[in-house]
Amino acid sequence: MSNKESNVALQTLRVTKDMKDFLSHRIVGEPPANIKIEYQKIHRYRTCVCPSTGHISELCPSGDLILSLGAHRNVIAAATVYDVVKNKTKSTTSKAGTSSTLSSLGLSGFQKPKIGSKNKKTMFSKQNNSTNESDESEGEEGSSLNDLPKSDLINAIMELASQGRNNSKGKGRRGGKR
């Protein structure tokens, strides 16, 4: 290793079906298959480069390598993390491993948002487009997930993780209200 080597690397986060379903209600266009997120290499540990506080992925209680946007409690739901090592991408978790991880974190049973319930607006809601009937006729092709600021994507994924935690209140390992 040379001193010229960068201390920042990329991880590619695969967008799963659950994540895609969630994002499709909040954006116009097709969600991407992968999201690339930078992380900082500190010795042998990997710490996320996030707007919030990072965490060391090796300290994940489930034992799997999970990429968090912000603090560890805000784990991305339904995500498979890929490790980028010397320009090669290899899978670090299996599909079964991801499912068991989500289950252990209490994030596996979240429900899709109900469209039109109390007109709850998110960062991805179109302010100009208030009716569902005109969605198809307008065909706004210029607005896709890739065009959105990174912070909007992070907020949507945080909302997804939060929704999963709320649906599992009282069932988790932390001993919620009983």
From Swiss-Prot:
Coiled coil regions in record: none
MF-aspect GO terms: RNA binding
Keywords attached to this entry: Host cytoplasm, RNA-binding
Similarity comment text for this entry: Belongs to the phytoreovirus RNA-binding protein family.
Composition bias, Basic residues: 168-178
InterPro entries, per the entry: Pns11/12 (IPR035351)
Function: Constituent of viral factories. Binds to ssRNA and dsRNA.
Subcellular location: Host cytoplasm
Residue numbers spanned by region Disordered: 108-178
Protein name, per record: RNA-binding protein
Keyword Endoplasmic reticulum: no
